[in-house]
Amino acid sequence: MSTNLRKTHPLAKIINNSFIDLPSPSNISAWWNFGSLLGTCLILQTITGIFLAMHYSPDISLAFSSVAHITRDVQYGWLIRNMHANGASLFFMCIYLHIGRGIYYGSYLYKETWNTGTTLLLLTMATAFVGYVLPWGQMSFWGATVITNLLSAIPYIGNTLVQWIWGGFSVDNATLTRFFTFHFLLPFTIMGLSMMHLLFLHETGSNNPTGLNSNTDKIPFHPYFSYKDLLGLILMLALLLTLTLFSPNLLGDPDNFTPANPLSTPPHIKPEWYFLFAYAILRSIPNKLGGVLALLLSILVLFLMPALHTSKQRTTQFRPLTQILFWSLIANLLVLTWIGGQPVENPFIIIGQMASILYFSILLILMPIAGVIENKMLS
């Protein structure tokens, strides 16, 4: 009797061990669907992105009109562009839910997987930022100007660094060209790192809702979880297509329908919705350098999660105190997202400052303390 090819062929064996015969915990819930959804998002974004790049011109005199040309004259160009723009929103929605699941169920204790994942988040944010500049609308231009300008807060080398990134003394043609280059390059870096992320995950196996060792109760990934993931995939694609076909500009900024004009500043400069929480933290500190550091720390705090875990239990499933803090953190992030989109005036300033303090307090102080208290209550 000959052995199954998928178990012997060098290439097929890798795929088999990663997606077919992979031993998976029998009790993982729908919260474990997001990894495959993110992979799908990445593939979808790459395909639509490549088709857009075929018709796009990274030049300040042509960029805006080339995007208009794509939506008007290219076969299904409107669909490709809207799927790419809204696909990014869906990508971040899945990322945030994936990270939230990781925090709730203590998945961050797989340090290598968690650290590669956090690095993936940073790379995805960088990709989304440079991509937002490409249509060369008002918000693209001013977003690029404001965010790159933050680097000038770095002592001594700040101004030189900003000019080096701009490729001149202002956001200009050189900036657009290099941003297009990075936007094309980074997704492939993300793909490579995603494979590393999976490699590290398969070294330990998946976590599960109980946080206990599940080696005694594993089932093959296919057909059980491949079909379960397929349901999540259909729901995600339904959401993406609904957004793309019925309300494609819902999450965009109206200012981006105006070509970039260095002589006119939009009344409210704000990023896409998925960056608003970090933008609110940045704005809540009156000092420029302090704001930049807080902005960085708001994401980099994820790297500290394994070190801040004080509880004897892995998941939050059986820890009521930490659960309250976790959901307070989620509510707080929603408040920050709302504040990020509001003008800099009272009462929004003080709400933003309070929410920023609470964000760091929950993650760095209250959650570790709650873990210690819960340990005491158990003993």
From Swiss-Prot:
The entry's heme b b566-binding residues are: H98, H197
* Any GO molecular function: metal ion binding
Superkingdom per UniProt: Eukaryota
Q: Cite the Pfam families for this sequence.
A: Cytochrom_B_C, Cytochrome_B
The record's listing under SUPFAM superfamilies reads: a domain/subunit of cytochrome bc1 complex (Ubiquinol-cytochrome c reductase), Transmembrane di-heme cytochromes
Residue numbers binding a ubiquinone: H202
Q: Where in the cell is it found?
A: Mitochondrion inner membrane
Report the principal subcellular site.
mitochondrion
Task: Provide the Gene Ontology terms for cellular component.
Answer: mitochondrial inner membrane; respiratory chain complex III
Q: Where are the transmembrane segments?
A: 34-54, 78-99, 114-134, 179-199, 227-247, 289-309, 321-341, 348-368
Where along the chain is heme b b562 bound? Answer: H84, H183
> Which note does the record give on the cofactor?
Binds 2 heme b groups non-covalently.
PROSITE patterns reported in the protein's UniProt record:
CYTB_CTER, CYTB_NTER
InterPro entries xrefs: Cyt_b/b6_C, Cyt_b/b6_C_sf, Cyt_b/b6_N, Cytb/b6-like_sf, Cytochrome_b, Cytochrome_b_C_euk/bac, Cytochrome_b_N_euk/bac, Di-haem_cyt_TM
- Annotated CDD domains: cytochrome_b_C (cd00290), Cytochrome_b_N (cd00284)
Q: Which cofactor does it need?
A: heme b
Q: What does this protein do?
A: Component of the ubiquinol-cytochrome c reductase complex (complex III or cytochrome b-c1 complex) that is part of the mitochondrial respiratory chain. The b-c1 complex mediates electron transfer from ubiquinol to cytochrome c. Contributes to the generation of a proton gradient across the mitochondrial membrane that is then used for ATP synthesis.
- Family, per entry: Belongs to the cytochrome b family.
Additional information: Heme 1 (or BL or b562) is low-potential and absorbs at about 562 nm, and heme 2 (or BH or b566) is high-potential and absorbs at about 566 nm.
Subunit text: The cytochrome bc1 complex contains 3 respiratory subunits (MT-CYB, CYC1 and UQCRFS1), 2 core proteins (UQCRC1 and UQCRC2) and probably 6 low-molecular weight proteins.
Q: Name it.
A: Cytochrome b
